[in-house]
Amino acid sequence: DRLGSGSQVVNVTSQIGSMVVGANFNDLPYATSKAVMNMVTVQLATQLKEKGVSVVAFHPGWVRTDMGGSSADISVEESAHGILSTLETFPHADSGSFLRWDGSIHPW
């Protein structure tokens, strides 16, 4: 088994997968796929808890990529830095969380 105590599983999702934020987003396949990823996060967190493996879902932000476009809020580097910084101090007790790229809690 490759995942030992202290390992972290990071699922990149989207705020569109949130039941609160994504309810009015008009792209059923995309929203559904992200909602599924959020459930995968919760299920894996439950299954891996006893092994000491943390699982977290991240909304990376509106990122300047081909998909996000040039007017998006943040760069790829800012998003990645925020996620990695959050993971450095992420407590195992919070496994199963849905977070924004900056470490703040995202509503489910």
Predicted features and spans:
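C-terminal helical subdomain
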Residues: E50, A57-F58, T65, G69-W108
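Conserved helix-to-beta-strand junction in the class I
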Residues: R2
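Short amphipathic alpha-helical surface patches that serve as generic macromolecular interface elements
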Residues: N38-A45, V55-A57, A80-I83
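Conserved sequence/active-site signature of Rossmann-fold short-chain dehydrogenase/reductase
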Residues: Q15-G17, V63-R64, G68
